[in-house]
Amino acid sequence: MYPEDSRVSGGVATVDFLEGTYDYAAPTPAPTPLYSHSTPGYYSAPLDAHGPPSDGSLQSLGSGPNSPLVFVPSSPHLSPFMHPPTHHYLETTSTPIYRSSVPSSQHSVSREDQCGTSDDSYSVGESGAGAGAAGFEMAKEMRFCAVCSDYASGYHYGVWSCEGCKAFFKRSIQGHNDYMCPATNQCTIDRNRRKSCQACRLRKCYEVGMMKGGVRKDRGRVLRRDKRRTGTSDRDKASKGLEHRTAPPQDRRKHISSSAGGGGGKSSVISMPPDQVLLLLRGAEPPMLCSRQKVNRPYTEVTVMTLLTSMADKELVHMIAWAKKLPGFLQLSLHDQVQLLESSWLEVLMIGLIWRSIHCPGKLIFAQDLILDRSEGDCVEGMAEIFDMLLATASRFRMLKLKPEEFVCLKAIILLNSGAFSFCTGTMEPLHDSAAVQNMLDTITDALIHHINQSGCSAQQQSRRQAQLLLLLSHIRHMSNKGMEHLYSMKCKNKVPLYDLLLEMLDAHRVHRPDRPAETWSQADREPLFTSRNSSSSSGGGGGGSSSAGSTSGPQVNLESPTGPGVLQLRVHPHPMKPTE
């Protein structure tokens, strides 16, 4: 494409190229802007595809694939909407580019560019201090709602949020709204689906940091208040505050847990209001599972134990996911997370079973399609006593009219209280950060007391109910010990197929017990607890009789987590051991 000749008529020059004729605006004294609002943005065309004429005073402006090529001179009479001479396709990480002030409907910028660009990149470059200030103003405008990812209208209730989420959170905290999720408390909340589930939307509001007070104490507001006191500007503090405000919600929560009050993640958990704790606990509840196993009646000992151990293995996976959602649990060390779960897993499963069976007298609801009564559990040797204790505790729950908020608090207390006192003579190591676990336990206990205080009863009745609820935990611990002994005896008799995750938890509990018989454990059991072993040895532990106890391998806990530190991962094998007829 080379120009052959040019003709000027009425201020418009016509250039004849080999492939066609194009018009461009020649320099005229009239300050008429040539920019049209109907031509949005620029597209990244090759630099040498449509080069300017040889005079070098013109600059190419692409208006889209279907529009003719228009050349506009770089004169001082350009429209104020014109982009600076440096184009987007020249943008690199080493040269900061300032976005133009074109409205969002005309200038499309991807969300990744808006979120991924930090405030520190908007420094004064080749365009001067004026362009740097304009870029900084645009960076402040490019905010997204931390809840639904829509465009944020401002800093509301401690986070950047849109008008819709701000109004929703305001209505929720002013009124008494008992939202219930119709699904599994894991609904996706975005711009299009934020109105589909109010419970998950409110839960996400609390997760991203919305607070009733309206101001996060550890955010940039403190920075501006200190700046007004001293009257001086600290550039390092300002950049740190801006980076904190523009970080994603996950990074903000990590920053809060590591910098609040000098106490790590403990301060953020302690300062959490009781209503928020209760909402997080209810949102962390796992869904009700299905057995999906068709077994002919009447049940036999092998079929009942196979059904129960299969359901227990499935529930263990969901129990680990539930524990991760507890406030402050992921801030614990991996050793403490594993130890708490291994010490309380059967108690947690039992209180969940009792809660599901609270409205069905005489029956235990293990799953939606697995409901057993005492007569069906009596076919297993030693199971009738455990069934009677479970049904009696469910009757006690029903008599006390246990509420969902009280149940989730008791369930979390069982998990955290299991590591409060380490065994003196066992192989169980003490918790690395027992103070953090105690702080979590105190926070959840305060939430339970706060909920009881809102019942409107007298102080004496409130104190009595607190004692009645906490006394239930001793019964659940007693049932757990009975169930553990029964499950281990079934394993030794080779009457039940133990799945890998269930076997790991069972063996870990036996290793942790101080009163276990020393002669029943081999040298392999005295190896370090948290080591990865071959799964075939653990599956073969049910070979029969007392020899199975001697060859039982320890729990297989994968410490090298691919998802980062503080995330518990237990190795789960999909193929269980087949029962021996």
UniProtKB/Swiss-Prot annotation:
Keyword Transcription regulation recorded: yes
Region Disordered, residue ranges: 45-66, 99-123, 216-269, 514-581
Biased composition (Basic residues): 572-581
Modulating: annotated span: 1-144
Zn finger (NR C4-type) start-end: 145-165, 181-200
Gene Ontology terms for molecular function: hormone binding; nuclear estrogen receptor activity; sequence-specific DNA binding; steroid binding; zinc ion binding
Skewed-composition ranges (Polar residues): 56-66
Gene3D superfamilies: Erythroid Transcription Factor GATA-1, subunit A, Retinoid X Receptor
PROSITE patterns: NR_LBD (PS51843), NUCLEAR_REC_DBD_1 (PS00031), NUCLEAR_REC_DBD_2 (PS51030)
Domain of life: Eukaryota
Keywords: DNA-binding, Lipid-binding, Metal-binding, Nucleus, Receptor, Steroid-binding, Transcription, Transcription regulation, Zinc, Zinc-finger
Annotated DNA-binding residue span(s): 142-217
Region (Hinge): 211-272
SUPFAM superfamilies xrefs: Glucocorticoid receptor-like (DNA-binding domain) (SSF57716), Nuclear receptor ligand-binding domain (SSF48508)
Skewed-composition ranges (Basic and acidic residues): 216-246, 514-528
One term under GO cellular component: nucleus
Subcellular location: Nucleus
All copies of domain NR LBD, residue ranges: 273-509
CDD domains: NR_DBD_ER
Subunit composition and interactions: Binds DNA as a homodimer. Can form a heterodimer with ER-beta.
Entry remark concerning the domains of this protein: Composed of three domains: a modulating N-terminal domain, a DNA-binding domain and a C-terminal ligand-binding domain.
PANTHER family: KNIRPS-RELATED PROTEIN-RELATED
Family from the record: Belongs to the nuclear hormone receptor family. NR3 subfamily.
Protein known as: Estrogen receptor
Organism: Sparus aurata (Gilthead sea bream)
